[in-house]
């Protein structure tokens, strides 16, 4: 559960750091993100500890739509479903038959999935951004301007102008790598995709 929470759920951030972002990097990243109003893809997710030892590997499908809508389904045997309707987030764990519901934190540093589905017009207020390009791949490294976030740095990689993968590194060096395949942008997604109906008999936790 930690992996999906790291990507999609918030933590408290209280201390501001001094940082900066190159205006050209900010403009280019913002343009790449904003041109996709919807995204659908398969994903594979790999988590390694600080020494490079594999901790967990999962796969699934995701759908995103601006502003703030997302559907993130992890396949069995570690099945989970996270759905945001833009106001609240529902996390369904079928093994526990439990739904956790909480308000969506709109801050990009607290809910990294919003980088792909939220308002990124003021992204430089949240991150120090640098970029590099090689072999047709554009990498952007984002470092939060606050302490006590879930991650110390986040990398977004684009191939041919489309999101290809992302990596999150936490304070102890643990890396979560997410590779997207079959990416489709700006195709209509049914509104029902972003609505979660609580299964009958499920335990409900409101946070």
From Swiss-Prot:
InterPro entries the UniProt entry points to: LolA/LolB/LppX, OM_lipoprot_carrier_LolA-like, OM_lipoprot_carrier_LolA_Pbac
Leader peptide range in chain numbering: 1-21
Cross-referenced Gene3D superfamilies: Lipoprotein localisation LolA/LolB/LppX
Gene Ontology biological process: lipoprotein localization to outer membrane; lipoprotein transport
Localization annotation: Periplasm
S-S bridge residues: none
Gene Ontology cellular component annotations, sorted alphabetically: outer membrane-bounded periplasmic space
Keywords for this protein: Chaperone, Periplasm, Protein transport, Signal, Transport
Pfam family, one: LolA
Record function comment: Participates in the translocation of lipoproteins from the inner membrane to the outer membrane. Only forms a complex with a lipoprotein if the residue after the N-terminal Cys is not an aspartate (The Asp acts as a targeting signal to indicate that the lipoprotein should stay in the inner membrane).
Quaternary organization: Monomer.
Family: Belongs to the LolA family.
Protein name, per record: Outer-membrane lipoprotein carrier protein
Name of the gene: lolA
């Amino acid at each position: 559960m930690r992996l999906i929470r790291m990507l999609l759920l918030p933590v408290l951030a209280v201390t501001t750091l001094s940082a900066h972002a190159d205006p050209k990097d900010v403009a280019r990243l913002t343009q790449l993100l904003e041109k996709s109003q919807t995204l659908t893809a398969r994903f594979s997710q790999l988590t390694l500890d600080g020494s490079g030892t594999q901790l967990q590997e999962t796969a699934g499908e995701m759908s995103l739509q601006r502003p703030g809508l997302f559907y993130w389904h992890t396949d069995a045997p570690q099945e989970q479903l996270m759905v945001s309707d833009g106001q609240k987030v529902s996390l369904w764990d079928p093994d526990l038959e439990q739904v956790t519901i909480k308000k969506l934190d709109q801050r990009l540093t607290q809910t990294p999935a919003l980088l792909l589905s939220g308002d990124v017009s003021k992204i430089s207020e949240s991150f120090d951004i640098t970029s590099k390009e090689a072999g047709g791949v554009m990498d952007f490294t984002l470092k939060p301007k606050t302490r006590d976030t879930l991650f110390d740095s986040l990398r977004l990689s684009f191939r041919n102008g489309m999101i290809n993968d992302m990596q999150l590194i936490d304070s102890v060096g643990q890396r979560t790598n997410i590779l997207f395949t079959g990416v489709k942008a700006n195709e209509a997604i049914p509104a029902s995709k972003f609505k979660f109906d609580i299964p009958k008999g499920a335990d409900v936790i409101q946070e």
